[in-house]
Amino acid sequence: MSEQNNAVLPKGVTQGEFNKAVQKFRALLGDDNVLVESDQLVPYNKIMMPVENAAHAPSAAVTATTVEQVQGVVKICNEHKIPIWTISTGRNFGYGSAAPVQRGQVILDLKKMNKIIKIDPEMCYALVEPGVTFGQMYDYIQENNLPVMLSFSAPSAIAGPVGNTMDRGVGYTPYGEHFMMQCGMEVVLANGDVYRTGMGGVPGSNTWQIFKWGYGPTLDGMFTQANYGICTKMGFWLMPKPPVFKPFEVIFEDEADIVEIVDALRPLRMSNTIPNSVVIASTLWEAGSAHLTRAQYTTEPGHTPDSVIKQMQKDTGMGAWNLYAALYGTQEQVDVNWKIVTDVFKKLGKGRIVTQEEAGDTQPFKYRAQLMSGVPNLQEFGLYNWRGGGGSMWFAPVSEARGSECKKQAAMAKRVLHKYGLDYVAEFIVAPRDMHHVIDVLYDRTNPEETKRADACFNELLDEFEKEGYAVYRVNTRFQDRVAQSYGPVKRKLEHAIKRAVDPNNILAPGRSGIDLNNDF
């Protein structure tokens, strides 16, 4: 069998050195867990970014099933200076999928490390391996009738909690800030040591998934969106399943209402009257997630005209902004908070409140209610069919939870997107003080001209938002080095100093978040 994927090699590695490493991978993992042929590597090179697949082609993929095997892979990589790109389930759609950040890196696939090690229904936590999916966890909870619920991103069933948390993804329940709910990591370092964060270093400790901090420096965050180690176990807290769950939607007809919506909502989030991550979705986000397509309304090139969007609102009952939230607790708690919430929106004098009883099984209400109650689904994949063609990049700047800021960001984004003939497909995810302004830059990747426009558009979005003091909190692998520049040279110098200390051979995902010892820092 050839040890070569069409001459795709790791940067700076000779064919001979690569072949030696592959032989050692085979001895360690078995032939079935070492993939080098082009057709075997296709699943690891399905990107949605505006570049050729070849730019992110792996040279090989290896699958580990134990921590000891991960340690062995790291040892081989150090011996032969082989860079590896680690994935858990590889479902990071819109952010790079499973493909490596740099051409030629070897994929370390942890999908076969898929044990649910423990779920404690009394202390409400889980400890899992990286290959565990949200769908797998949900099934386990249901089969064992456990009184806990999950929080996850959307679409959720095939993604996993470890990968999502390591990328600092968010969900839609009261536990929606996933990294905040993480408690205890096991990490294989570049030298092969196995490090446990928090209380995990104490022999016999039963508080590893209970108390986040441990003693001395708290290093969990150092391993997220970074390349300082390989997470092989993660603990996280689970929300006790409430006796009453009341989802609702508030539909607003006017795009200008965003200022009043956010300013009315913020006190409800700060006081925890509404405890979950609230969503305010644009019309086109609603349309895509309801599995409508642009072609049903217009075949004209360019962005979708406002007149067409207005017609869509009229036809479907969707708003210019569509707010989704939920109440949780005892019946008494929910009743009290429901009166507070409805009084706020009645005082606002705009917005039509829709309850679950009124919405029934209609989409997108149904899948939103599922997301807010910990039921995984794949409904939001419909966004990718809005325009079609397989192109998607998430542009995710952070804003204050202040109406004027949201209005400003929405206007900026629309202006740039429309300049390049693309649609504003967006949602705000509302925390007590901040908002994630998540925009899906959708384009036809089979159209070279449109792909070129999408690339220019994303660059301009980064530039224009940075001029106003905004930066994204997460980005696809094509733009990670560019976004790292937004945060200034001191941060980058420190990140590279840490990299030199913990990974002097630069084997762990060089280029992740712009951290690469080949950079001049």
From Swiss-Prot:
The keyword Transferase does not apply. Pathway: Aromatic compound metabolism; p-cresol degradation. Residues 54-268 form the FAD-binding PCMH-type domain. Disulfide bonds: none annotated. Signal peptide: none annotated. Keywords: FAD, Flavoprotein, Oxidoreductase, Plasmid. One of its GO terms (biological process) is lactate catabolic process. Its cofactor is FAD. It catalyses: 4-methylphenol + 4 oxidized [azurin] + H2O = 4 reduced [azurin] + 4-hydroxybenzaldehyde + 4 H(+). Its EC number is 1.17.9.1. Catalyzes the azurin dependent hydroxylation of the methyl group of 4-methylphenol to form 4-hydroxybenzaldehyde. This is 4-cresol dehydrogenase [hydroxylating] flavoprotein subunit. The gene is pchF.
